[in-house]
Design a protein with these regions (language model features):
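Conserved AdoMet
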Residues: 1-30
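Conserved Class I SAM-dependent methyltransferase catalytic core
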Residues: 133-171
């Protein structure tokens, strides 16, 4: 599939990159940063685009080893160097210090599953899409708490969010 002028392989272990994510990359590329971390990298689309368009050191984390294999292949095919790390962010207490953290974590509520198009459910991993209704901000809260200690001074967080929880996510 195409993303930000790149050719990427996707499969049932990765989300299919969407235009909203390209817009997120546009915003990030306006920033000055030396080191960036993508949490929940999936196909690697975000860190690959960042590595292709900057000289920054780029790291990427995912809980899925299968997704990381695809991300590594995509990085190689697009001739960029990224440090991929197999890690469950919810079980993590330390990260490398970076200037920028980006994440498109699971944010669709389990109760919204029936509203999701069948082609999404058929071809994309539920692990990357859905979050429990009782704790919809779990990933944002964890990443924000890690950012306190592992974002460099003047560092920034970039998230894709569920519009339903926009205000709560900001808080």
């Amino acid at each position: 599939t195409g993303f930000y002028g790149l050719k990427l392989k996707v499969n049932e272990h990765t989300l299919i990159p969407r235009p909203d994510t390209e817009q997120l990359v546009d915003w990030i590329l306006k920033e000055n940063f030396v080191a960036a971390l993508d949490i929940g990298t999936g196909s690697g689309c975000i860190p690959i685009a960042l590595a292709k368009h900057t000289d920054a050191k780029v790291l990427a984390i995912d809980v899925s080893e299968d997704a990381l294999l695809i991300a590594e292949e995509n990085a190689k095919n697009n001739e960029v160097e990224i440090d991929f790390i197999h890690q469950d962010i919810l079980q993590t207490n330390s990260l490398q210090k970076v200037d920028l953290i980006v994440s498109n974590p699971p944010y669709v509520l389990e109760s919204e599953k029936e509203k999701i198009q069948e082609n999404v459910l058929d071809y994309e991993p539920e692990l990357a899409l859905f979050v429990e209704d009782k704790n919809p901000l779990i990933f944002y809260k964890k990443i924000a708490s890690l950012a306190i200690n592992f974002l460099n001074e003047n560092g920034k967080l970039f998230f894709e969010i569920n519009a339903k929880f926009g205000k709560e996510t900001i808080e």
